[in-house]
Curated annotation (Swiss-Prot):
Gene name of this polypeptide: guaAB
ATP-binding found in the keyword field: yes
One GO CC annotation: cytosol
Top-rank taxon, per record: Archaea
Stated name of the protein: GMP synthase [glutamine-hydrolyzing] subunit B
Length: 370
């Protein structure tokens, strides 16, 4: 049965009115899920809802101001600057899961303070079905999944969590966003993880990697925005890698294995494995066969070289673009090489050694690297 946004709003309105009997903070990340949850709640509950966006330092360029301006006709969004607190607390951390957990702790500690400042009792957030399915399956910690994990938010942070979209999938959230009058730039927006660029600085977090990635993200999004892809973004990781003779012989082209690890999914559980880089450019179906062979080892992401940059560089930029119906499974996008080369040519930071393209499906990779 197809999703009916009007029916959903009619059903959720009395539930929200009954549950939320005091002031509520609506946490907005700028992604479609949290923004839709906030606008929906604000429409139903009015001034009881205070929409806030925490600038964690892991947002894209000018993101907080852009989102605030886009939403000004729908709700008043307050931006709270916590950049230094978040970056200094996470700097130097390498493990993907530890980074996500630390981010979650910081995020909810900050929200707890905001809830108290506004004398609120509730936190409205944009958890959707895919989030809690993944987290309960142990694939990765989605920072906004608390109730499903059995975390007592009232005891831990002093607020009750309200999740009006928890039974919806991404395509249904987009339909609801459109129905609620959100700008096209929001409902067609790229999914953006709660921890933002933190989980796209793969491996050790440094300020240098973060700032390079922020600039590169603008370049990648600008060039891929018209291709009708489900999700597309850039990652940065250390270029240190070793040539692997055994794997190279098996797939018939040069393979190197990076020292940086990335998250994947084997069966229904999280796997932490290597990133493999291949040097041969073939048609996408041949590349798919290579990817399938390589991921039968402890490899969770396979990337193919687009262009060498500065030989003295120490970072690799990975471009990831996928198509998917439900974000539970995904296929890599078959982007024209000329477009990928154009992007690589526009990426000019001297610390960048190479630009690569990710050719891994989900599974065995997760869409994000961490």
């Amino acid at each position: 049965m197809s999703f009916d946004p009007q029916k959903f709003v009619d059903e959720i309105s009395p539930q929200l009115k009954e549950i939320v009997d005091g002031r509520a903070i609506a946490a907005v990340s700028g992604g479609v899920d949290s923004t839709t949850a906030a606008v929906l709640s604000y429409k139903i509950l009015g001034d009881k809802v205070i929409p806030v966006m925490i600038d964690t330092g892991f947002l894209r360029e000018n993101e907080a101001e852009n989102v605030k301006n886009m939403l000004k006709d729908l709700m008043p969004l307050q931006v709270i600057d916590e950049r230094e607190k978040f970056i200094s607390s996470l700097e130097g951390m390498s493990d993907a899961e530890e980074k996500r957990k630390k981010f979650r702790q910081l995020f909810y500690d900050t929200l707890s303070r905001i809830v108290k400042e506004f004398n609120a009792k509730y936190l409205i957030q944009g958890t959707i079905a895919a989030d809690w399915v993944e987290t309960q399956g142990g694939i990765k910690t989605q920072h906004n999944v608390l109730v499903q994990l059995g975390i007592d938010t009232e005891k831990e942070w002093g607020f009750k969590v309200v999740e009006p979209l928890a039974d919806l999938y991404k395509d249904e959230v987009r339909a609801l966003a459109k129905y609620l009058g959100l700008p096209r730039d929001i409902y067609n927006r790229q999914p953006f993880p709660g921890p933002g660029l933190l989980v796209r600085v793969v491996g050790k977090l440094t300020r240098e990697k973060l700032e390079i990635l922020r600039k590169v993200t603008t370049t990648v999004e600008k060039n891929l925005s018209e291709l009708n892809l489900s999700q597309y973004f850039a990652v940065i990781f250390d270029s240190a890698a070793e040539y692997n003779k055994e794997l190279s012989n098996e797939v018939g082209c040069d393979v190197k294995v990076y020292k940086t690890l990335a998250t994947g999914v084997k069966g229904d559980v999280r796997a932490y494995g290597n990133i493999a880089g291949i040097e041969c450019r073939k048609d996408y179906e041949s590349l798919r066969e290579i990817m399938e062979k390589l991921t039968s080892y402890n490899i969770t992401h396979v990337v193919v070289k687009i262009k060498d940059k500065n030989p003295e560089g120490i970072y690799t930029i990975g471009i990831r673009a996928v198509n998917t119906q439900d974000f539970m499974t995904a296929d890599f996008a078959k982007i024209n090489w000329n477009i990928l080369e154009k992007i690589a040519n526009e990426i000019n930071d001297k610390k960048i050694k190479e630009v690569v393209y990710d050719i891994t499906t989900k599974p065995p990779a997760t869409i994000e690297y961490e």
